[in-house]
Amino acid sequence: MSREEGNNGRRPGGKMRRSRKKVCAFCVDKAEFIDYKDINKLRKYVTERGKILPRRISGTCAKHQRELTSSIKRARNIALLPFTTE
Protein backbone atom coordinates (compact mmCIF):
# COMPACT_ATOMS: atom_id res chain seq x y z
CA MET A 1 0.00 0.00 0.00
CA SER A 2 2.34 2.69 -1.18
CA ARG A 3 1.42 6.09 -2.48
CA GLU A 4 2.77 7.63 -5.63
CA GLU A 5 5.85 9.64 -4.91
CA GLY A 6 6.33 13.17 -6.20
CA ASN A 7 2.68 14.20 -6.00
CA ASN A 8 3.23 16.68 -3.14
CA GLY A 9 -0.41 16.58 -2.01
CA ARG A 10 -1.82 17.81 -5.30
CA ARG A 11 -4.74 16.32 -7.12
CA PRO A 12 -3.78 13.98 -9.92
CA GLY A 13 -4.00 15.21 -13.49
CA GLY A 14 -4.44 18.89 -12.82
CA LYS A 15 -2.55 22.13 -12.72
CA MET A 16 -2.56 23.99 -9.40
CA ARG A 17 -4.32 27.30 -9.76
CA ARG A 18 -3.47 29.94 -7.21
CA SER A 19 -6.51 31.93 -6.19
CA ARG A 20 -6.28 35.65 -5.62
CA LYS A 21 -6.51 36.87 -2.03
CA LYS A 22 -9.88 38.40 -1.26
CA VAL A 23 -9.97 41.98 -0.03
CA CYS A 24 -12.15 43.03 2.88
CA ALA A 25 -15.10 45.02 1.50
CA PHE A 26 -15.43 46.98 4.74
CA CYS A 27 -11.76 48.04 4.69
CA VAL A 28 -12.11 49.19 1.07
CA ASP A 29 -15.19 51.28 1.98
CA LYS A 30 -13.37 52.56 5.10
CA ALA A 31 -16.42 51.66 7.19
CA GLU A 32 -16.09 52.79 10.80
CA PHE A 33 -18.66 50.27 12.02
CA ILE A 34 -21.07 47.73 10.59
CA ASP A 35 -24.67 48.76 11.15
CA TYR A 36 -26.97 45.96 12.30
CA LYS A 37 -29.93 47.74 10.66
CA ASP A 38 -28.40 47.51 7.17
CA ILE A 39 -30.04 44.19 6.30
CA ASN A 40 -29.12 44.20 2.61
CA LYS A 41 -25.41 44.34 3.43
CA LEU A 42 -25.70 41.71 6.19
CA ARG A 43 -27.58 39.27 3.94
CA LYS A 44 -24.53 39.00 1.67
CA TYR A 45 -22.63 37.39 4.55
CA VAL A 46 -25.32 34.85 5.54
CA THR A 47 -25.98 31.59 3.69
CA GLU A 48 -29.43 30.65 2.45
CA ARG A 49 -29.71 28.36 5.48
CA GLY A 50 -29.00 31.28 7.81
CA LYS A 51 -25.40 30.51 8.74
CA ILE A 52 -22.75 33.23 8.91
CA LEU A 53 -20.12 32.86 6.18
CA PRO A 54 -16.56 32.21 7.40
CA ARG A 55 -13.69 34.61 6.69
CA ARG A 56 -12.06 32.40 4.08
CA ILE A 57 -15.22 32.54 1.96
CA SER A 58 -16.44 36.09 2.65
CA GLY A 59 -12.96 37.64 2.42
CA THR A 60 -13.37 39.96 5.41
CA CYS A 61 -10.50 40.79 7.75
CA ALA A 62 -10.51 39.51 11.35
CA LYS A 63 -11.64 42.81 12.85
CA HIS A 64 -14.59 43.22 10.51
CA GLN A 65 -15.53 39.53 10.72
CA ARG A 66 -15.95 39.89 14.50
CA GLU A 67 -17.97 43.06 14.02
CA LEU A 68 -20.04 41.46 11.26
CA THR A 69 -20.83 38.44 13.44
CA SER A 70 -22.05 40.58 16.32
CA SER A 71 -24.12 42.74 13.94
CA ILE A 72 -25.77 39.68 12.39
CA LYS A 73 -26.52 38.24 15.84
CA ARG A 74 -27.95 41.58 16.97
CA ALA A 75 -30.14 41.79 13.85
CA ARG A 76 -31.37 38.24 14.49
CA ASN A 77 -32.32 39.06 18.07
CA ILE A 78 -34.54 41.95 17.03
CA ALA A 79 -36.02 39.89 14.16
CA LEU A 80 -34.49 41.79 11.24
CA LEU A 81 -32.77 38.60 10.04
CA PRO A 82 -34.06 35.05 10.45
CA PHE A 83 -32.15 32.52 12.56
CA THR A 84 -32.88 29.78 10.02
CA THR A 85 -34.81 29.42 6.80
CA GLU A 86 -36.87 26.43 5.82
Curated annotation (Swiss-Prot):
* Underlying gene: rpsR
UniProtKB keywords: Ribonucleoprotein, Ribosomal protein, RNA-binding, rRNA-binding
GO terms classed as biological process? translation
Task: Relate the protein's function as given in its record.
Answer: Binds as a heterodimer with protein bS6 to the central domain of the 16S rRNA, where it helps stabilize the platform of the 30S subunit.
GO cellular component terms attached to this protein's record: cytosolic small ribosomal subunit
* UniProt superkingdom: Bacteria
What Pfam families has UniProt attached to this entry?
Ribosomal_S18
Its recorded name reads Small ribosomal subunit protein bS18
Instruction: Give the taxonomic lineage as stored in the record.
Output: Bacteria, Bacillati, Bacillota, Clostridia, Eubacteriales
